[in-house]
Design a protein with these regions (language model features):
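N-terminal secretory signal peptides that target proteins for export/translocation
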Residues: 1-8
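Bacterial N-terminal signal peptides
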Residues: 8-22
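Terminal, non-catalytic domain-edge segments
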Residues: 23-47, 154, 158-179, 205-212, ...
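Solvent-exposed loop and edge beta-strand segments that line ligand/cofactor-binding
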Residues: 32-40, 74-88, 136-149, 211-224, ...
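N-terminal carbohydrate-binding/catalytic regions of secreted carbohydrate-active enzymes
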Residues: 45-90, 94
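Long, well-ordered core segments of solenoidal/helical folds
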Residues: 46-60, 110-127, 175-193, 245-262
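Intrinsic, low-complexity N-terminal interaction/targeting segments
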Residues: 61-70, 124-136, 140-143, 194-216
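Eukaryote-skewed repeat-based solenoidal scaffolds used as protein-protein interaction platforms
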Residues: 108, 112-115, 119, 136-188, ...
């Protein structure tokens, strides 16, 4: 168990950018629950047309915006698509659903363009960059940050049910899914020969933990690793390698948890204070050498506590979370399933 320094953090006046991005990016995904009649009606067709207008020339969609409510009226050549912040996969799911309901070949063709783009973007080692083509900056790294690669793999897994796909694409999707899982296993960080968790991004060639933005240094990630483990626990008939990866990751989360503290609001501040009734917490980043939490400003210098960094980053990033709680819950269910086999 890790004991942090008690810190006081000012709350931002506005919602964190990551939360805003999630709220916007969920729009296309939420519409999947609508009926076939809705997709065939005026609202459904108008929404599909709006989504189609936002597709980039490569086949992807931009992030941090609602692609469902209004059409894009700018220069299509300037659209920058990405896999980050739930972009592209939700739009593709919508178009697949729209094609099933309407038979609209425009939706079909746009879906296939985006689907092929995802397959093309995958590295030979099974990883994905944040967007494709990735350029030379940190976006080229294999991107687990904010669930990017897991979301792509879930999309490929679910594509088994997509009627819009032909047999050859189904086959390619299955192969890409397998390569992606193998990439996850190879990226898992070994400490003393023991598998632990993952960094938010890994070098696309060496698979080593990699830096992204100045405050996102190579680390053991308490956030992204939770999503990866939950994904691995969803795999049917897991291989011994997947089982070993899950076991190592779950053990790391148990060892890294911060007990006896609560991180939450107190007036206009956010406070980390002693509370023995509080559920466990995890830090966003843990040092690769010491295993202790660290925090970082835009100067790229590690700090031992969050109150040692500036207000802008301190209030604009998720430095603590309850990510491991969902890991423990899913692991208990996973163990029961494995015992039943």
């Amino acid at each position: 168990m890790i004991r942090p320094a008690v810190t006081r953090v000012l709350l931002p006046i506005l919602l964190p950018l990551a939360l805003i991005a999630d709220l916007l990016a969920e729009s296309a995904g939420k519409l999947l629950e609508n009926s076939d009649d809705w997709f065939r009606g005026d609202d459904g067709r108008r929404t599909a047309a709006n989504i189609l207008s936002w597709q980039s020339s490569h086949g992807s969609w931009p992030k941090n915006g609602d692609t469902t409510r209004k059409p894009y009226r700018g220069d299509r050549a300037k659209l920058k698509g990405t896999f980050d912040n739930k972009a592209t996969t939700d739009e593709l799911r919508f178009l697949s659903r729209a094609f099933d309901a309407t038979g609209d070949t425009v939706c079909r063709d746009a879906f296939l363009k985006g689907f092929d783009h995802i397959l093309e973007a995958q590295y030979p080692n099974g990883g994905w960059p944040q967007f494709h083509p990735p350029g030379k900056q940190y976006h080229r790294h294999i991107t687990f940050n904010d669930g990017t690669m897991v979301r792509l793999l879930e999309f490929l897994r679910d594509s088994r049910e997509f009627k819009v796909l032909d047999p050859e694409r189904h086959k390619k999707a299955a192969a890409a899914f397998g390569r992606g899982v193998e990439c996850i296993l190879k990226c898992q960080i070994l400490i003393g020969g023991k598998p632990t968790v993952w960094c938010a991004q890994h070098d696309e060639v060496t698979l080593a933990p990699a830096k992204a933005r100045d405050y996102e240094l190579p680390s053991l990630s308490g956030s992204e690793s939770a999503g990866i483990l939950r994904f691995l626990m969803d795999i049917e008939n897991p291989s011994p390698s997947v089982i070993r990866a899950v076991k190592g990751g779950v053990e790391w989360f148990e060892a890294a948890k911060i007990s006896g503290y609560r991180y939450g609001k107190s007036g206009n501040d956010r406070v980390l204070k002693k509370d023995f009734s509080a559920p466990p917490l995890w830090a966003r980043f843990y040092d690769l050498d010491t295993g202790k939490p660290f925090f970082c400003d835009r100067d790229g210098i590690k700090k031992d506590s969050v109150d040692q960094i500036g207000a802008e980053r301190r209030n604009g990033y998720a430095w603590y979370g309850n990510w491991g709680v969902s890991v423990a819950k899913d692991h208990a269910k996973w163990l029961r399933r494995q015992a039943g086999h």
